Amino acid sequence: MEPPLWQRLVAPLMYLLPWSDAIPLGFGPDGLFLQYPVLRPLVLPALPLMQLERSIPFGLGGLLLFFVLFLAVVRNPNVPYFLRFNALQALLTDIALIVLSIGFRLSLQPIAAGSLLLGTLSSAVVVAVLAILLFSLVECLRGREPDLPGISQAVRMQLY
């Protein structure tokens, strides 16, 4: 059964969460958005979410948003499955992105700060998250579940 139009329009908004966390990686010293200013308009859809995350003190905005999405959407059986699936998939993508970002900061930043290696890896992560966002957007608008290898299987195991 194909999800109704409102679900197909709301589901892609979930993927703005990992996109908002990938954007700072693109503004590093050799960041993608600094090298290619034509890509900067891609930041605009995530700005309201980034402002919301930063409006809560002590950096707890992202954590609060995570818990709201997880408890109010993913774990709520009254929310349609299509929205729950996409919310959890976006949250797992965001967790993977945060772990990568922390790994970059702890392992590569001290030894390769400002180097080509760090800039290349950061740009690759931004491009990967952008590809996930665009793929998920198209699949959601078509009314299909975006099938991300590894992540989608974990989502299905959690939701069933």
Please give the residue ranges for each predicted region.
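Alpha-helical membrane insertion/targeting regions
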Residues: 1-160
